[in-house]
UniProtKB/Swiss-Prot annotation:
It is found in: Cytoplasm. Keywords: ATP-binding, Chaperone, Cytoplasm, Isomerase, Nucleotide-binding. It comes from Pantoea ananas. Pfam families: Cpn60_TCP1. InterPro entries: Chaperonin_Cpn60_CS, Cpn60/GroEL, Cpn60/GroEL/TCP-1, GroEL-like_apical_dom_sf, GROEL-like_equatorial_sf, TCP-1-like_intermed_sf. It catalyses: ATP + H2O + a folded polypeptide = ADP + phosphate + an unfolded polypeptide. Its main location: cytoplasm. This is Chaperonin GroEL. GO terms for biological process: protein refolding. Forms a cylinder of 14 subunits composed of two heptameric rings stacked back-to-back. Interacts with the co-chaperonin GroES.
Length: 541
């Protein structure tokens, strides 16, 4: 086992604080509308330019092992805030730095670290309650656009696009961000349920100019099995032909004689048919077939529940207003399923999302909710160069997360004002002893740090602005973009409550651990380890 280097007390804390400051100083230059860029060198290709706090934090590794431990713990704050709310990483880092710096000063002055931590925790719990009181719901498009704009570093086009996307697909819809091909940002909305399976034979195409199959008011047969024998399907085909409507078959697979017969029938115009494979695999395929059945008011023909294809009747088939199938995708528009049944299914899937442990499962379940409830929107980010594209895409993703958080828990005044107002409400808060009171003061002082940093990045004097803001009340604050004071809500400067809350909670959590650190252990650098193998000297001869 390698030899260890151990540091205690103040020696350890000073080293740790140095690491915290290096990381936090690099991250906090990006805060606010006048935040600066950070250039990150890559081992290959062009460097990345970013204003995204968590991207900067992830790049930082320090040579000194003890300093690096401090930096890595603050990196954890940024990552956790990013995972919880998708934004607020820089705010969380600034808060953590302030709590750690002030907290370690108090420890050096002889305060009890455990009581300091208890005081900080008490202040944060009270602050979260105050934030909830300040929070206002964010439901209209204008507020959503404002939140998106602020989170995308004051890029109005991004905020407006996200608001449009949410309007089109609803709050539950899936919105994805992709790299576009042009210079302009575009919004692409897919209404109805779309899944990644195309037609099984190009002979089904009835719109040669677009290379697609379009079926108007079709019946939809859903089968959880492979269909290779046409005899199984004859009763359904005859019933559909009599009804004079087209038929879409969604099955595990359609092959051999069955597929050939369907193609011949289509080409002769006897009955208009198209076949596609069911989406997904295994249990997920069964679940998605059930989703389609509920959306279209049909039944999945499955041998597991004792249903046979030969005995299927028209009542078992789903229906939709229109179906469009191309090479890779199938879109079902306006299924005739009952709204109450669809809502019941959505509630059931939401419950599964709550219980899911892996991010992949959550994402897939979220997609299913979107397909049933709203639709899917794709934001295509446009830019002139690859470097700009990457930077912009990261900002758009941040803005999207922030708007979702805003819809979820509401919004508070932005620009660091909400935390200043919260701190003002808690001046009377007291702990069980003087050391805990100092901990409370440390947390309350830290709540001013995001406002001070935004002002500092804008090139103004933080103390002057902070005093002016504190002299006001409610949503009165400082707009660093235009350098004027006024109502932050009227300025359109909003922060999602969830983002502010998460930033404060994670910053206090990690900072509390660091203040109560008394010993740090790391491997000795290779060159410093004692050389135990220095051989015994040979006999001179």
């Amino acid at each position: 086992m390698a030899a260890k280097d151990v540091k205690f007390g103040n020696d350890a804390r000073v080293k740790m604080l140095r690491g915290v400051n290096v990381l936090a100083d690099a991250v906090k230059v990006t805060l606010g509308p006048k935040g600066r860029n950070v250039v990150l060198d890559k081992s290959f290709g062009a460097p990345t330019i970013t204003k995204d706090g968590v991207s900067v934090a992830r790049e930082i590794e320090l040579e000194d092992k003890f300093e690096n431990m401090g930096a890595q713990m603050v990196k954890e704050v940024a990552s956790k805030a990013n995972d919880a709310a998708g934004d607020g990483t820089t705010t969380a880092t600034v808060l953590a730095q302030s709590i750690i710096t002030e907290g370690l000063k108090a420890v050096a002055a002889g305060m009890n670290p455990m009581d300091l931590k208890r005081g900080i925790d008490q202040a944060v719990i009270a602050a979260v309650e105050e934030l909830k009181k300040l929070s206002v719901p964010c439901s209209d498009s204008k507020a959503i656009a404002q939140v998106g704009t602020i989170s995308a570093n004051s890029d109005e086009t991004v905020g407006t696009l996200i608001a449009q996307a949410m309007e089109k697909v609803g709050k539950e819809g899936v919105i994805t961000v992709e790299e576009g091909t042009g210079l302009q940002d575009e919004l692409d909305v897919v209404e109805g349920m779309q899944f990644d399976r195309g037609y099984l034979s190009p002979y089904f195409i009835n719109k040669p100019e677009t290379g697609a199959v379009e079926l108007e008011t079709p019946f939809i047969l859903l089968a959880d099995k492979k269909i290779s024998n046409i005899r199984e399907m004859l009763p359904v085909l005859e019933a559909v032909a009599k009804a004079g409507k087209p038929l879409l078959i969604i099955a595990e697979d359609v092959e051999g004689e069955a597929l050939a017969t369907l193609v011949v029938n289509t080409m002769r115009g006897i009955v208009k048919v198209a076949a596609v494979k069911a989406p997904g695999f295994g249990d997920r395929r069964k679940a998605m077939l059930q989703d389609i059945a509920i959306l279209t008011g049909g039944t999945v023909i499955s041998e597991e529940i004792g249903m046979e294809l030969e005995k299927a009747a028209l009542e078992d088939l789903g229906q939709a207003k229109r179906v469009v199938i191309n090479k890779d995708t199938t879109t079902i528009i306006d299924g005739v399923g009952e709204e109450t049944t669809i809502q019941g299914r959505v509630t059931q899937i939401r419950q599964q999302i709550e219980e899911a442990t892996s991010d992949y499962d959550k994402e897939k379940l979220q997609e299913r909710v979107a397909k049933l409830a709203g639709g899917v929107a794709v934001l295509k980010v446009g830019a002139a160069t690859e470097v700009e594209m990457k930077e912009k895409k990261a900002r758009v993703e941040d803005a999207l997360h922030a708007t979702r958080a805003a819809v979820e828990e509401g919004v508070v005044a932005g620009g660091g004002v909400a935390l200043v107002r919260v701190a003002a409400q808690l001046t009377e808060l007291r702990g069980q002893n003087e050391d805990q009171n100092v901990g409370i003061k440390v947390a309350l002082r830290a709540m001013e740090s995001p406002l001070r940093q935004i002002v500092s990045n804008a090139g103004e004097e933080p103390s002057v602005v902070a005093n002016n803001v504190k002299a006001g009340d409610g949503n009165y604050g400082y707009n660093a973009q235009t350098e004027e004071y006024g109502n932050m809500i009227d300025f359109g400067i909003l922060d999602p409550t969830k983002v502010t809350r998460s930033a404060l909670q994670y910053a206090a959590s990690v900072a509390g651990l660091m203040i109560t650190t008394e010993c740090m252990v790391t491997d000795l650098p290779k060159g410093d380890a004692p050389d135990l193998g220095a051989g015994a000297g040979g006999m001179g001869g």
